[in-house]
A protein has these predicted regions:
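Active-site-adjacent structural elements that line small-molecule/cofactor binding pockets in enzymes
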Residues: 1-278
Length: 278
């Protein structure tokens, strides 16, 4: 199993020195990925217990990961897109491509839970088509209602080309379906073993109904943990088919965050860690 950390752009990690130190420590310990929250503003009051407090500082994810690309070598850098991202294909194509360009091919893009909510209207599908065209076509073009493209270029393109990895977040049938049809992976919110098992059962149902392009490869599943699972539960996650555990950074001081990463590595890595790629 792989391990990632979520929230490298918020809380105490909104301080650049803290974020760099945590990223380098995570890479040294064996984590494989940094995931950023895509929030541009936070709801007040908190909508659920695992949400960040309304006054939590949040640095723009693209700015954060662009800086961390310079200070890390192998970590995957997962850019959290904000709700409403499907309204602007050019912006998110540029942000994803720029991150991938600066990080030597380590960029990935995380679509928010609300992305697939109105998939039936065609906005999201056209947004994805526009990104793929801008990233991979010599002559980017989309004939569409929402994101028509013609007579433009948007260099630099991603090092990974049109298949810069996309993740879809959310525990809903439409989010799973979108991940299967267009994504590298699905980020499943998982408060506990029961909710993870329910999510994996939903994935199995959607896989039976959906046709996934062979060009996308096998779907990866990451769980965004609400709390640290027990080793027994983590073993059950593996048996269910989970590929990665993504852990939320607690909203604490730098020293506490460093200790958190070290405690996670000590608790899990000897028994569960797959070596990061690259």
């Amino acid at each position: 199993m792989h391990f990632g950390i979520y929230g490298i752009n918020q809380g105490a990690a909104a301080d650049p020195e803290v974020a760099v130190g945590l990223a380098q420590l995570a890479e040294e310990l064996g984590f494989d990925s940094l995931w950023t929250a895509g929030d541009l503003a936070l709801p007040d009051p908190k909508p659920h217990p695992y949400a960040a407090a309304p006054a939590t500082p949040v640095v723009h994810p693209a700015l954060c990961l662009g800086a961390l690309a310079e200070h890390t070598d192998h970590l995957l850098l997962v850019l959290g897109a904000s709700e409403g991202c499907a309204q602007d294909a050019l912006l998110w194509a540029k942000l994803g491509a720029s991150l991938d360009h600066w990080s030597d091919g380590r960029g990935q893009l995380l679509l928010p839970p609300g992305f697939a909510a109105d998939a039936g209207q065609g906005l999201e599908a056209e947004w994805l088509e526009a990104l793929r065209s801008l990233w991979g076509s010599d002559v980017p073009a989309v004939e569409g209602r929402f994101h028509p493209l013609s007579n433009l270029q948007a260099a630099p393109r991603p090092i990974q080309g049109a298949r810069l990895p996309l993740w879809v977040q959310g525990r809903s049938a439409v989010a799973v379906r979108t991940a299967l049809q267009a994504g590298k992976g699905w980020l499943c919110p998982g408060e506990d073993l029961e909710t993870v098992a329910e999510g994996m059962a939903m994935l199995a149902e959607e896989e039976a109904r959906s046709e996934r392009s062979s060009a996308l490869g096998l779907l990866e599943v990451s769980v965004l943990a609400g709390a640290l699972p027990s080793p027994e539960d983590l073993e059950a996650y593996e048996e269910l088919g989970v590929d990665r555990l993504v852990l939320r950074l607690p909203p604490d001081r730098a020293q506490v965050l460093e200790a958190f990463l070290e405690d996670v590595a000590e608790a899990y890595f000897d028994d569960f860690l797959d070596e990061p790629e690259g």
